[in-house]
A protein has these predicted regions:
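Pyridoxal 5′-phosphate
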Residues: 109
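Catalytic cores of secreted/periplasmic lytic hydrolases that degrade extracellular macromolecules
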Residues: 7-15, 21, 26-101, 112-211
């Protein structure tokens, strides 16, 4: 028996040339369907993906998940994201921010690390850049890790948590630009591109599908 689809009540399964539906409660054993535990875990994580999901909490992915989905991407020609998969995971755990969102934002802003700002300044987000002189104004980081962590802290403190919300290291959020912990909420004060949420979500969806 091979599991094709799974929800709380029903499973779509195949056996040889047959396809049918059975109650989920009947297919909860690895002995009945090898791999069902992992498939169920992945499907539950994927089911949380939504364009309006809250980004001020971890994704639920493991370190191995991060390594898997950020490895062997043809567009990641310099292996920047592959080499920093653990950084995105650790930042997620440390600061309570969805690490897949953060990686997707970096992919979008840097063109998979191919932008001049990303390569010269190890700045995957265009952080600090102004429209009139983006390269000159963008912050320079010593490492990609430093840049990822800096932007994560900045978003947690100013964008995705309400004022006075408890955040990392017993600090409180300023909530300066808070308009909700979602892509649309962030983009309201973060950028001028009205399609920014859609563009970032496209990469989030791509990465979640690689689980």
């Amino acid at each position: 028996v091979t599991l094709q689809e799974l929800n709380d009540e029903w499973c779509k399964v195949t056996y040889e040339s047959y396809t049918g539906y059975v109650k989920s409660s009947l297919l909860t054993s690895e002995a009945v369907t090898p791999g069902i535990g992992e498939k169920n875990r992945v499907q539950k994580i994927r089911s949380t993906l939504d364009a309006n999901m809250s980004l001020n909490k971890p994704s639920g992915l493991t370190l191995e998940d991060f390594k898997k989905i950020l490895s062997n991407n043809a567009s990641d020609t310099n292996k920047i994201f592959e080499q920093n998969a653990e950084v995105f995971y650790n930042v997620e755990q440390k600061y309570n921010i969805n690490g897949i969102f953060l990686a997707s934002m970096a992919i979008h802003e840097s063109g998979w690390g191919s932008s001049k700002i990303a390569k010269d300044k190890k700045n995957l987000f265009g952080f600090g850049a102004y429209d009139r002189s983006p390269y000159d104004s963008a912050v320079t980081f010593a490492t990609y890790e430093e840049g990822i962590e800096t932007v994560a802290k900045y978003l947690v403190k100013n964008y995705i948590n309400e004022k006075n919300a408890k955040i990392y290291n017993n600090e409180t959020a300023t909530g300066t630009y808070y308009n909700g912990p979602t892509l649309v909420g962030i983009s309201t004060r973060y950028c001028t591109d009205k399609d920014w949420p859609t563009k970032v979500y496209k990469y989030m969806n791509y990465l979640y599908e690689r689980l």
